Amino acid sequence: MWFSCATTSSILFVAAVVLASAPQGNTESICTLSDSETCAVESLTSPSADGSVLVYPGGDTRCAFDNYQDSTTGFTTNSTYFFQVFPNTNLDKSKLLIFFQGGGGCTDDNTCAFGLECSLAENALFTTVATVRGAGVIDRFMMDNMFKDWNVVFVPYCTGDVHVGNKVLPPFESGFEQQLGNPQCLGKNLPMHMNGYNNSKAALGWALQNFPDVENLVVGGASAGSLGAQFFSSHIAEMWDVDAKGTRFSIMADSYVGVLPDSRPLPVLLEYFGACDNGRPFPADVAAICGDGNASTTEVVEALIEDKPDTNWLFINSKGDDVQRYYYALVKESIQGYPFPNLMSEEDLYRNMSAILEAYQAVSPRITTFYVEGDHHVFLMEKNFTSYKSDKDLLLGDVINEWLSSNSSLNLDTVSAEIEIAPKTSGTTL
């Protein structure tokens, strides 16, 4: 019957499952913003065992759905939002990593609705609770993690809108939910809050207040967070005034490029999320492209690249990424197409993905791409992320170190001891 293939289901929703786990905090690792409490980084002196503090901003932040606990399936929602801060232990504020979490996504009224998400239970399309992870680039105890001594602001994801939504959807049930066998999930009358923009804005505002004059600012993201990092790139560069201050500014986008069907191009999704208004998060010229339903992913991100031409970009992807292929099918067919028997092939994904990234390289010499053979999804949240090899047998850790060590006048004609850098006219492909 429908939804009978557990293996396919696990692959389809892996982005929502593997990228989140419950935080292990205690009272000493929490700070709540208020009129009398700014949670200044200097005051965060009692971090939890992983070196982090959870900051609860309150205000207009929240996750997608009101609080709910399903006693049958264990499906949980919680409206409360927080972000996670890893301060440098010596209060050295020269380096800051802002990282947008992944965790699935929704695409339309069917897939964004509470009834379907609850009925899917452990296979929900996106995370509905703010969560954290301690692995990969945010692991303070991983010896070869090049970010272990950076200040890190980790932006959790619980809204299904690639961090940029600004819209409330009324309760909706299409009838498909009834086929999933969880009638207790139906008729709850819960709206869906696409609140990613406000959540991101709260984390970014706190980060700017506490790290206003960094020398090196990297904005990263994995899966849905990869798109969040890309979409917020110009906005963050303006917030930190990187051009005037000479800040080295970089975007590290892991495992989502934005290969989408012509029938529902990126601006259509962004408009659905309520993300195309000027300043949320796009500058005016990009917002205009965003509002054009016929524009492509390439046109939107190219405009962001050209808006801040000194930004350094690193795109990390596997050539056959299974989640990117399934999300393409979900956007094209909605939930009615499940279990998506005719997925885009790995070869077609790579061809489309590389065409997009080559277009970016044509407008900027600061685009580096790192391709891994296979279908793996997300690298930077893995405990062994530095050891992944590219299709040219280069280690991801070596590539990131080279990428970070280059100054703002990066000369792409140079050849390092370990990494061959491509000609200036074509960006860098590793």
Residue ranges and their predicted role:
Residues S4-A22, T27:
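Cleavable N-terminal signal peptides of Sec/SRP-targeted secreted and luminal proteins
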Residues P23-L430:
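C-terminal His-loop and adjacent cap/lid subdomain of alpha/beta-hydrolase
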